[in-house]
Amino acid sequence: MASVIEDKMNLDREPEVDSLPQREKSTTIISPNQHALIRLPSEGLKIIDLKPGGIISLGKFGTFAVDGILGYPFGQTFEILEELKVKPIKSMTMQADETSVDNENEELTKDDLTKMLSNSSDNNQNIINIGSKIQKLTSEDVDKLKESGATSDIGQRIIEQMIAGHEGFDKKTLFSQQKYLKRKQQKFLRRFTVEYLGSSQLLQYYIEKDTQRVLDMSEETLGLLLNYANVRPGGKYLLIDETGGIILYAMMERMNGQGTIVSAHDNEHPNHIALRYSDYPEEMQNRMVKSINWLQFLEPENEKVEFETATEEEIEEMKHAKRAQYYRREQRAKNINSVIDMVMEGNFDGFISVSTLNMPTLLPEIIPTIGGSRPVVIYSQFKEALLETQHHMSTDKRVLAPSIMETRVRPHQTIPGRMHPVMCMRGFGGYILWGTRVFPRESGITAVGKGSGKSKKEKPEQIPEAVSQQASV
């Protein structure tokens, strides 16, 4: 009997809410055993696992030990030294901190490098485009400098010699010189920045990797989506997520470990692969995230799992492996039936859809499960798909004022005295359809309140003055 109780207690059952640990990962300090985002000088992104004693390779930028960056705040920039060591610096392009520099041969900042040659020009009209001939330093010379050692000042030495060998550098404007210097620093300096891997940063990573995987969604659109959906701690939401779990991760961040998210999917198992970077405890994920397939959602009465409960005597007679299998099947049946009961109960605090499904055919089954005055938010990368859904909502009358929203953040290049947008940027972002769930009155509307009582008296027609004088005569 004791072994039966022990096997049953070892199952993955949902613990009590009060006994659950909240978010254990650090959002401010670089801590071990969690994921982080590396931002390279070339503006590339890399996700790393901060395992103590591990070694991270950044390709041409070098290799470093994980222990050297632990304990620093997120957002700290490092420079790779010899023997897998790193030192903290201010930024990708700024000079290293005096307290963290061990040698006196400090690198030059962009202002110091700009002053190496003569004064800059007021404009670029004196520059003659002769291609690569304007640079005396050849690619073979650069390769020799790279092979001379893996020290931290090799990149700075290459940049200095490239500026000294550039015949037209003094003919550039000061702003053009700084842009040239920044490009070379991004290419040759062995630096990187460690950032916290939140949902926004994870979306940036997938945008650089494959925009179709996140359905062309931008960061500002993700923020607008969560804002219109009114995602908050303690809520109960219905979600369709075809981005691999990025929307689910963003919702869990906002909900701070409190609430429930029912994720509807069309496969045997949901695709939440992005949650592996969230570093949330498994117990927290199991408690907050509930999955249900569309067959269970549309036909809940027929899809409930019927489980035959065995008696204690029958359980005692089972072998250890069969007993564990029995408890797993029992727990699975309870989990599925509890999610189906939750959907049948309805009254969700909001509905979010980020998918390629045809929503006009699916909304009639989803809208009844949404609570009154709750938001219905649908994202699509194509506006035409949302126009059809908006027309369907307008005729349904169970969703109030469906509106299509669009947001764009355009980066600008700032120059002293003038400012203009960056010439090249991605044309993605997507569109959001937002409405409010309402309950229309089935019968006619009855007016309430006092009326005016009396109709306005008509003013007598004014008789022309000439006609009145003739009548008096």
From Swiss-Prot:
Keyword entries, A-Z: Nucleus, RNA-binding, tRNA processing
InterPro entries: TRM6
Domain of life according to the entry: Eukaryota
Chief site of localization: nucleus
Localization of this protein: Nucleus
MF GO annotations: RNA binding
GO biological process terms, semicolon-separated: tRNA methylation
Keyword Isomerase: no
Keyword Heme: no
GO terms for cellular component: nucleus; tRNA (m1A) methyltransferase complex
Residues in the signal sequence: none
Region (Disordered) residue spans: 1-25, 445-473
PANTHER family listed in its UniProt record: TRANSLATION INITIATION FACTOR EIF3-RELATED (PTHR12945), TRNA (ADENINE(58)-N(1))-METHYLTRANSFERASE NON-CATALYTIC SUBUNIT TRM6 (PTHR12945:SF0)
Subunit record text: Heterotetramer; composed of two copies of TRM6 and two copies of TRM61.
Record family assignment: Belongs to the TRM6/GCD10 family.
Role summary: Substrate-binding subunit of tRNA (adenine-N(1)-)-methyltransferase, which catalyzes the formation of N(1)-methyladenine at position 58 (m1A58) in initiator methionyl-tRNA.
Name this protein carries in UniProt: tRNA (adenine(58)-N(1))-methyltransferase non-catalytic subunit TRM6
